[in-house]
Amino acid sequence: MLTPEDKAAIVAEYATSEGDTGSPEVQVALLTHRITYLTEHFKSHIHDNHSRTGLLRLVSRRRKLLDYLHKKNAQRYFDLIKKLGLRK
């Protein structure tokens, strides 16, 4: 799970300015970390369908934020997906 120390490290790495916690980059990075955690969780808990629904919501929210960022600033979008190792 995401500890406060992990969250602070992710926020510090992806923040666009001091104290930035709401930029799309930070939000996408936090969602990506949670998605990765849940993906690993499903390798040992195959029948956890309730959490799978939550995973689909997280993926959808991340997709919407990435679409927003691509529409507003394509260069920041491409830098972020490259840094996170997402597929595009």
UniProtKB/Swiss-Prot annotation:
Keywords noted in UniProt: Ribonucleoprotein, Ribosomal protein, RNA-binding, rRNA-binding
Family annotation (SUPFAM superfamilies): S15/NS1 RNA-binding domain
GO molecular function: rRNA binding; structural constituent of ribosome
Keyword Iron-sulfur: no
GO process annotations (BP): translation
GO cellular component: cytosolic small ribosomal subunit
Keyword Lyase attached: no
Any Pfam family hit: Ribosomal_S15
NCBIfam families in the record: S15_bact (TIGR00952)
Function of the molecule: One of the primary rRNA binding proteins, it binds directly to 16S rRNA where it helps nucleate assembly of the platform of the 30S subunit by binding and bridging several RNA helices of the 16S rRNA.
Record-linked PANTHER family: RIBOSOMAL PROTEIN S15, BACTERIAL AND ORGANELLAR, SMALL RIBOSOMAL SUBUNIT PROTEIN US15M
Complex formation: Part of the 30S ribosomal subunit. Forms a bridge to the 50S subunit in the 70S ribosome, contacting the 23S rRNA.
Family membership noted in the UniProt record: Belongs to the universal ribosomal protein uS15 family.
Protein's name in the database: Small ribosomal subunit protein uS15
Organism in which the protein naturally occurs: Hydrogenovibrio crunogenus (strain DSM 25203 / XCL-2) (Thiomicrospira crunogena)
